[in-house]
Amino acid sequence: MSSHTSTPNHASAAPPRKWYDMTSAEFYVYVVAFMCGISMLMPINAVFSAPSYMLQYYLYATKDPNHVPQMTNFWSNVMTYYNLIGLVTGLVMEPLTLLKSFRKIPMLVRLLGGLCILIVEIIVLMAVPARGTTEGGAVATMCIAGFIGGLGKSIFESTVYGMFGAFPPSFTSIMMGGVGISGVLTSLIQIIVKAALPDTYEGVKKQSYIYYSLDVGIQAATFIALIMMRFNSFAQLHFGDLGGVKSKVDAGSLAGAGENVREPGAEATELEQYTEPAIGQIQEKNAEAHKDDPLVDREHSDDVDEHGDALRAVEGPTSNEILRATSIISVLRSIKWMFVSCAFVFVVTLFLFPGIATGMFPESKWFATVAVFIFNCCDVLGRVAPALRFMWPRSYNQRWIIVAASFARVIFVPLLLLYSYHYIPSEAYGYVIMVIFGFSSGYVASMSLTLGPQSKGIDNDGKRFVAGTLMGISILVGGTIGTVLSIMTQTIREKY
């Protein structure tokens, strides 16, 4: 490759594309990315949106509204334990998805399998109370459901992050927006349902059925949308057909990444490197990159031009072969700072939220509900902020700003701990701090997840997929550490 390709040429870079230039196939992939984001956290959001049902699950499992619990510590912290079981399961399982044996499984199978497991999680939570069991059985059910949820989430999440890591960065931003919308949607429904139904034994049961039915419906819609995406031309251009057939992009190509073609490791110094050309421009760029390559099948290319099928111009290895040939360690070295940034965001967020951040007014019927809703709304605003160009670092070398912002969020620890001890007794303070806390969490996490697969040295689809998967693991690492710290802190507070 000639030396001029390693230096960004902004004059020749494709201009930003207008929304009306988007093809229907590309729009459909955006919709699927959004739906995948919603589905990713919908089960845990549905569970957390019915806290009364979870905190008193033993009443419904035993079918006894007057049952006196024997395992009081477990039920007092059931939400935290449930979340921790899922996180630990994911922390163990998600790295296993990077094994070569697992990477042989077609992506579509992984996606649909993960969704099915997440649906089973909700079915278990609803089926056991329908048949009835003991309090011990209720505890076992919660642990099993948490494990099932963690297993399904690890498979689905790692594949989604990896898959959309191979697409232009705006798809990751849209997917992250869906993750945030999932929380907003469940919080909004929680407020409506809480106002409409009484907090009685039967009222709480109806509330839980509403949340869980919504979850299953969304998962089913995503299931169908993913099956249809297998036949989507835009998806095929970026990562085969999700089923393990020949990829339409060769293993070393940068086509579809929304970047200028450059040598591996060449530094992308300006924001314009992330602009996304139209499909035709991608194909022209790919052809230009290979025009001097003697290995390219000229006769095949001429035949493709004759039939007008640009998607078959370069037929590379299968998407699974690309994945198996990718070095995990080298990818981790390339994304290490974005990995650390993303992990630390979730250390702080899950250390403080929801337990410490919303538990200071237990006698208030609405404080926790409204605080969670505000957090979720601001979180989704932060997650979609990277869709705005001015919210990105101005150059590649300014990525340190995202890492610094991640570590700067540690300031929320003393602010919210002091608030939880009522040194600042105002509920209004809690609402205001949730605005900043939620937006910063969503923005820094989304930017880290978006920039990770766009790092130096991540120069083909296989590396982008692995980078996206590793960024998903960073969420689990940070979330697990934060949740453990939260449990330890709240246990100490109960004793002292």
Curated annotation (Swiss-Prot):
Residues 1-26, 99-107, 157-172, 230-336, 387-399, 453-464 are cytoplasmic. Adenosine transporter. InterPro entries: ENT1/ENT2, Eqnu_transpt, MFS_trans_sf. GO terms for cellular component: plasma membrane. The lineage of its organism: Eukaryota, Discoba, Euglenozoa, Kinetoplastea, Metakinetoplastina. Its main location: membrane. It is a multi-pass membrane protein. One of its GO terms (molecular function) is nucleoside transmembrane transporter activity. Keywords: Membrane, Transmembrane, Transmembrane helix, Transport. This is Adenosine transporter 1. It is found in: Membrane. Belongs to the SLC29A/ENT transporter (TC 2.A.57) family. Residues 48-77, 129-135, 194-208, 358-365, 421-431, 486-496 are extracellular. It holds the Pfam family Nucleoside_tran. The chain crosses the membrane at residues 27-47, 78-98, 108-128, 136-156, 173-193, 209-229, 337-357, 366-386, 400-420, 432-452, 465-485. It catalyses: adenosine(in) = adenosine(out).
